Amino acid sequence: MALQLLPSTLSVPKKGSSMGAAAVKDTAAFLGVSSKAKKASLAVRTQVATAPSSVTTSPGSATAKPSGKKTLRQGVVVITGASSGLGLAAAKALAETGKWHVVMACRDFLKASKAAKAAGMADGSYTVMHLDLASLDSVRQFVDAFRRAEMPLDVLVCNAAIYRPTARTPTFTADGHEMSVGVNHLGHFLLARLLMEDLQKSDYPSRRMVIVGSITGNSNTLAGNVPPKASLGDLRGLAGGLSGASGSAMIDGDESFDGAKAYKDSKVCNMLTMQEFHRRYHEETGITFSSLYPGCIATTGLFREHIPLFRTLFPPFQKFVTKGFVSEAESGKRLAQVVAEPSLTKSGVYWSWNKDSASFENQLSQEASDPEKARKVWELSEKLVGLA
């Protein structure tokens, strides 16, 4: 049985949260796992090498040494939104190497557990933990539960996202923030800030934080110029808390709500946040901070709230017209590369892939790479999540 961190008590989400999932209270318990299995899965792992010393080094394992000497331990990666789509595909790709233990941080832990089994992920290669990014309390509870599990943290992947392209009225998180920005940006911002302490404590040689971006938030691309275009404006909506009641639910302060733009704006925040982490922490800590666009995953559940005609026509359009279609499996491999490949350790980079599936450093738009705007987004976000 795969190791799972399941909540021992449930509570109803705060009024205002439209995510529809039960929130987990502070306590959590391991269920159905022997103490021996827990120790094997949670301890800082070492592997005894018996192969000749000529074995090539790869992420999560070191060059093999003579028998009886220890090699680099297995890496631990936390992936948010790992119950489906890109997150699940990346979790599977990393777990299959045997070099990574994957913590699947998901709102619906039962769905995540079933998805891992359906994907064929081996027992003991993953841990399912509850995380609802629409609740800042849940984010803090996740961090507490993760630390109680006494696992190291070597890589954090901020992947989870919601997309409400047809919405014309906002919904709000448990903390009263517009849902798309609240989940995609603010929840991840708090998670990443809190877990920086754990990343800094890790003895893993290639510690990383990866924040998934999107081409739709990058206005120097064709896709980024499809209306409505991402634009954060002067951030007056973010400064007002995105509550909608006393101000705008849009980051730029626009009084009319547009779900598609809210998503795109949240991805600009993701890419700005990655760069600000790089500026503030990389030189001091050596941690690699990066973002990526893995390609157009036209069949992903991210589009489930789009109109039926779009869901029908978009995949073949991407496959046969733009040639930009990427399967979930391929996108997962690309995200796994950013997590583990030695060639992708450069910090502050936004990774993309060409049609030959070769990675390259992509250029971000002026807004998505504006250091002053990144600083302002950081400082406003600190206030909204209670860190300032």
From Swiss-Prot:
Designated name of the protein: Protochlorophyllide reductase A, chloroplastic
GO BP of this protein: chlorophyll biosynthetic process; photosynthesis
Reaction(s) the record says it catalyses: chlorophyllide a + NADP(+) = protochlorophyllide a + NADPH + H(+)
Keyword Transit peptide: yes
UniProt keywords, alphabetically: Chlorophyll biosynthesis, Chloroplast, NADP, Oxidoreductase, Photosynthesis, Plastid, Transit peptide
Annotated metabolic or biological route of this protein: Porphyrin-containing compound metabolism; chlorophyll biosynthesis
Transit peptide: 1-74
Presence of the UniProt keyword Transit peptide in the record: yes
CDD domains hit by this protein: LPOR_like_SDR_c_like
One GO cellular component term noted in the UniProt record for this chain: chloroplast
Purpose: Phototransformation of protochlorophyllide (Pchlide) to chlorophyllide (Chlide).
Superkingdom assignment: Eukaryota
Any one GO molecular function term: protochlorophyllide reductase activity
Family note: Belongs to the short-chain dehydrogenases/reductases (SDR) family. POR subfamily.
InterPro entries: NAD(P)-bd_dom_sf, Prochl_reduct, SDR_fam
Enzyme nomenclature, EC number: 1.3.1.33
Species annotation: Triticum aestivum (Wheat)
Subcellular location(s) per record: Plastid, Chloroplast
